[in-house]
Amino acid sequence: MTLYQIKPLFQSLLRPTMFWLYKHHVTANHITLTALALSLFTGLLLVLVAQPILFLLLPIVLFIRMALNALDGMLARECNQQTRLGAILNENGDVISDIALYLPFLFLPESNASLVILMLFCTILTEFCGLLAQTINGIRSYAGPFGKSDRALIFGLWGLAVAIYPQWMQWNNLLWSIASILLLWTAINRCRSVLFMSAER
């Protein structure tokens, strides 16, 4: 069970916004680049001003990013805007945005740099394994338990928590360790989905 499974409900809430954007000639690629720019700006701000209180921004930005990610996909599929450039921007944008938004955790007090870097590596690995499934079977794997939406929820809540209760940062490394384990589990599940689908065929 992952948050990805409630994506259809989220999309239905965003559909009026999608039609408004389409009517005003906003393309899927515009939305993708906006999400990337927002993530890079926020990440840079959190790195340059490494104050826990600023991590209040993280849940807000992550929610906006999730909405933008949903909108770019909807515009691409439902408004006939799918392009090869869009696919490249989407996949690379997701990985770069994840790094930009989660790298600032490295600069928080009590954070072990090696654990944060390991977590970021595992994040990239899960996305790679999802794409690997698409390359082999033609269907991208979104298997959990720690997909993009789940990460946004957990890390957004943690950003809120350390902003309000800075003393909670003593648990940073425990969270990075658990997150890395869940990410590796996710990567394994995505690879297994490739094997199962191949066996069924």
What are the functions of these language-model segments?
Residues F55-A87:
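Glycine-rich active-site/cofactor-binding loop and its immediate structural neighborhood
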Residues M1-F63, A100-R201:
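Hydrophobic alpha-helical transmembrane segments
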Residues M74-S114:
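Basic, amphipathic juxtamembrane/active-site segments
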